[in-house]
C-alpha cells in the first residue's frame, strides 16, 4: 500500500538575512486532517518558516511542496490561492474598520465588481463570528479588547477556503472558555480533512490537541514524533537543548517576609469597570492577580498608575497619598506598569534598545540646554541590559530585532530606569517560550528580593501558583477573595474567578481601619 502524499511538505529549506541564518536545511511535513504542533524557543525559526509557507518571505534554498508538487509561494495572495492560511500571533487587523470588513478584506480584494453588498457581508461575518464569540461584527476593531481582537483574527482565517491553517500562539490572549471553543473548532476542521499547524509554548494544549510534534532549535530541525510517544519534559528538553530544572524560583522564605506595606489600595473604583477594590502589597512580595479576562484586572492596574481616571477610593505609597492623574506622575512617584500589549504600548519597536530604556526618564539624561547626554544614556542602557541578561547585538540595535523574551526584558529595563518602588505587570510572559519564561520569573524574584513590590496579573494559573506569594482573585470588578499558602490551588482560584464563594475582601479590609 502506497504511503499518502503530504498535503504540505518543506524540504531542506534555508533562509538567510545577510550573514544571519534564520533557518538551516529544515524539513517538515503535514498530513491531510492532521493537527501538527511546531515547537521551539523564540528565535528557533518557527515564525520564519510560517512566513515562508504564507508567502511573506521567500526561502534562500530548498523547496515547498503542496500535494507532492513543488510550488513558488511568492506572496500571501499566492498562498491563499493554494489554500494556505495563517492566523498571526501579533494582531494584524485594521482598527478603524469594522469586524466584518476585517474578516472579509481578503475576499473583497479579489472581487471584480466595484459594488459591495454590506448587508450580506455582515450577515455572513456574524455567522462565522458566532462560532467563536457573540461579538457584533458592526463594531470597530479598535474598540475591542485584545482577546476579542484575537478572536476576530481567528474568525478571519475561517472565512478563507483553506486546506492548511497555521495557528501561531492562538490562545495567548484567550480565556479558558474561549480556548475550549477554539479547540472544538480545530477538531471540527480536522474532521473535515483540513490540516492544522499549531504553534504553541503551552504543553497542555499540544498534548490534548495535536497528533505529531516537530521541534526546531536555533534555526534547525531537531525531531518529529507522535505526541503519544513523548512527554512534555521530552519536548521541553528538545526545545532548549538543556534541562530546565525549575521553572519557578523559590518563593519568599518566612525569614524574608515583612509586614511593611509598600502600596495600599482602599475602596478604589472608576464608576464602571471596577469598584470597592481593597488590597495591600508588602515590600519584596510578588502578589498575583487572577480572574477571567474582562473581570477588571487590567483596569484596576491602570487606575492605580494614572492611566485610567478613578472616582472613588485612594492609593497610598509608603503611607503617603498617591494622586497620579497621569502615568508620568505615577512613574515619577515610583509606581510603574508593564502593559499586556507589549508591542502596542510597552516598547517602541523601531527605536533602539538604549532609546527605549531612556524614554521614561529623559529629564535626568538632558543637560541645561536640553541636549541629550548620549554617554549617560548608553551607560544606563549597558548597566540595565547587563543586569537583566538581555541577549542582543548591541544597545543601538532596534528592539524589533530581539526575540519576544528579550523584548520583554527591555520593557522591564525601561521601567527600572526610574528606580521604581512598585511594578505592576500585566501578562508578563505572554507569547514567550519556556526558557525565556523561566528567566523572567527569576528576574522578577530577584527584583522582589531587592525590595521592590511586584503585582503580576496573569491568566496562566500555573504561573500564579508557581511564582506568586499570594493571589488576589477579581470577579466582576472587585476582589472576590485571596488565597495563599496551602489554599493556593487552581480550583480555589477558578471558583473565586467564576463568582463561587461570593465577594470577600476580609483580608484586605483588616488593614482598612
Curated annotation (Swiss-Prot):
GO terms for molecular function: ABC-type D-ribose transporter activity; ATP binding; ATP hydrolysis activity. Residues 8-243, 256-501 form the ABC transporter domain. PROSITE patterns: ABC_TRANSPORTER_1 (PS00211), ABC_TRANSPORTER_2 (PS50893), RBSA (PS51254). It catalyses: D-ribose(out) + ATP + H2O = D-ribose(in) + ADP + phosphate + H(+). It is a peripheral membrane protein. The keyword tRNA-binding does not apply. It is an enzyme of class 7 (translocase). Its EC number is 7.5.2.7. Its main location: membrane. It comes from the Bacteria. It is found in: Cell inner membrane. Gene3D superfamilies: P-loop containing nucleotide triphosphate hydrolases (3.40.50.300). GO terms for cellular component: plasma membrane. ATP binds at residues 40-47. The complex is composed of an ATP-binding protein (RbsA), two transmembrane proteins (RbsC) and a solute-binding protein (RbsB). Belongs to the ABC transporter superfamily. Ribose importer (TC 3.A.1.2.1) family. Part of the ABC transporter complex RbsABC involved in ribose import. Responsible for energy coupling to the transport system. This is Ribose import ATP-binding protein RbsA 3. The gene is rbsA3.
Amino acid at each position: 500500500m502506497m504511503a499518502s502524499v503530504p498535503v504540505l511538505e518543506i524540504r531542506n529549506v534555508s533562509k538567510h538575512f545577510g550573514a544571519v541564518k534564520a533557518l538551516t536545511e529544515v524539513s517538515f511535513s503535514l498530513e491531510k486532517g492532521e493537527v501538527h504542533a511546531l515547537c521551539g524557543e523564540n528565535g528557533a525559526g518557527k515564525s520564519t518558516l510560517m512566513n515562508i509557507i504564507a508567502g511573506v518571505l521567500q526561502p534562500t534554498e530548498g523547496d515547498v511542496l503542496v500535494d507532492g508538487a513543488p510550488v513558488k509561494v511568492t506572496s500571501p495572495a499566492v498562498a491563499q490561492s493554494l489554500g494556505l492560511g495563517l492566523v498571526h500571533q501579533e494582531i494584524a487587523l485594521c482598527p478603524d474598520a469594522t469586524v466584518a470588513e476585517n474578516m472579509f478584506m481578503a475576499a473583497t480584494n479579489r472581487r471584480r465588481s466595484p459594488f459591495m453588498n454590506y448587508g450580506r457581508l455582515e450577515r455572513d461575518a456574524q455567522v462565522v463570528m458566532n462560532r467563536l464569540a457573540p461579538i457584533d461584527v458592526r463594531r470597530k476593531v479598535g474598540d475591542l479588547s485584545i482577546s476579542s481582537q484575537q478572536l476576530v483574527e481567528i474568525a478571519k482565517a475561517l472565512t478563507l477556503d483553506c486546506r492548511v491553517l497555521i495557528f501561531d500562539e492562538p490562545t495567548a490572549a484567550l480565556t479558558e472558555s474561549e480556548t475550549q471553543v477554539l479547540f472544538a473548532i480545530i477538531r471540527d476542521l480536522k474532521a473535515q480533512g483540513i490540516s492544522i499547524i499549531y504553534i504553541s509554548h503551552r504543553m497542555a494544549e499540544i498534548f490534548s490537541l495535536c497528533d505529531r510534534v516537530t521541534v526546531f532549535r536555533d534555526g534547525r530541525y531537531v525531531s518529529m514524533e507522535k505526541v503519544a510517544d513523548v512527554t512534555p519534559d521530552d519536548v521541553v528538553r528538545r526545545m532548549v537543548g538543556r534541562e530546565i530544572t525549575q521553572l519557578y524560583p523559590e518563593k519568599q522564605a518566612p525569614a524574608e517576609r515583612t509586614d511593611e506595606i509598600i502600596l495600599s489600595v482602599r475602596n478604589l473604583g472608576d464608576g464602571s469597570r471596577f469598584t470597592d477594590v481593597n488590597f495591600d502589597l508588602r515590600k519584596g512580595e510578588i502578589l498575583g492577580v487572577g480572574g477571567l479576562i474582562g473581570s477588571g484586572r487590567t483596569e484596576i492596574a491602570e487606575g492605580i498608575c494614572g492611566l485610567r481616571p478613578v472616582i472613588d477610593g485612594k492609593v497610598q505609597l509608603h503611607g503617603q497619598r498617591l494622586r497620579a492623574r497621569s502615568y508620568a506622575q505615577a512613574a515619577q512617584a515610583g509606581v510603574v506598569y508593564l502593559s499586556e500589549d507589549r508591542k502596542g504600548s510597552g516598547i517602541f519597536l523601531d527605536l533602539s534598545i538604549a532609546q527605549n530604556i531612556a524614554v521614561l526618564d529623559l529629564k535626568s539624561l538632558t543637560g541645561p540646554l536640553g541636549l541629550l547626554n548620549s554617554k549617560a544614556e548608553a551607560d544606563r542602557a549597558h548597566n540595565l541590559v547587563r543586569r537583566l541578561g538581555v541577549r542582543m547585538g548591541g544597545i543601538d540595535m532596534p528592539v524589533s530585532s530581539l526575540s519576544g523574551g528579550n523584548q520583554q526584558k527591555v520593557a522591564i529595563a525601561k521601567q527600572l530606569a526610574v528606580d521604581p518602588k512598585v511594578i505592576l505587570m500585566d501578562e508578563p510572559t505572554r507569547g514567550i517560550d519556556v526558557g525565556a519564561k523561566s528567566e523572567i520569573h527569576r528576574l522578577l524574584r530577584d527584583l522582589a528580593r531587592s525590595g521592590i513590590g511586584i503585582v503580576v496579573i496573569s491568566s496562566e494559573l500555573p504561573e500564579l501558583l508557581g511564582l506568586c506569594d499570594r493571589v488576589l482573585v477579581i470577579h466582576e470588578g472587585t476582589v472576590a477573595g485571596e488565597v495563599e499558602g496551602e489554599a493556593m490551588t487552581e480550583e480555589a482560584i477558578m471558583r473565586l474567578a467564576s463568582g463561587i464563594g461570593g465577594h470577600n475582601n476580609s483580608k484586605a479590609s483588616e488593614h482598612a481601619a
